[in-house]
């Protein structure tokens, strides 16, 4: 099993490392074997090297299905103008949107990544407060299937394409029939699931502890039966925020027609739901041992690299039975 940390490939973020050796020394000090990288710009100094890249996280947009379907009325309501739409998606048409995903897949291939991750999810700012949905799970899954098939049909990629669960509309790993439907309809043969434990815990607002979260994950694995064998990787973290969500949805803010202001205000709300904290309860060992993933990425939030290293070592210690 590869133990990994997530990293952002972008000049300003990578500026904290003088050399590639510094970055490698950092993730080794965390007890990890390599990186899951998301490309958010250029890496002009080539700090991230193919030797350290095990996985790549593909570009993602939280709210993209209406853009994909060309629903101009919804885009106008949510973003206010074509100019803001252009700023959000860095394009104004399907072909250029598709090109962004293909470019990330090409990058994953060039870097020798063993896997690439795709978010099968959609949520607007308003939905993130109300939990009242504009799309069904199947609508989001169908849009994702269409995009992925366009990107991969006829391509000669060698990486595993891993589909990640979230708690919004789309793939949540809570409905085995939808999980099977999604896997059946994606043409790419070398496919599987990236199970995000914190996201799965977010899907059940009744959870009040890490242990209850682990029990819920086991229950979802039970319900998925043989489909669980498609889990090739895990994003490991915990989130116990159900009580917050149950209170927050009682009094959602009104729709704000200033998109960038509403996005900034929603950011803290989302981080309060999806906390990306390290597991400290030994119950998580049973989850990881049961799944036995090939790739385990410690996807943890932290204020700086030192804290991230501390949290990663802590979660590794829990996995190793030292806590």
How should each PLM-predicted stretch be described?
Residues 6-12, 37-40, 56-63, 118-120, ...:
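A cross-domain feature marking catalytic cores of carbohydrate-active enzymes
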Residues 90-192:
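Active-site acidic/histidine proton-transfer and metal-coordination neighborhood
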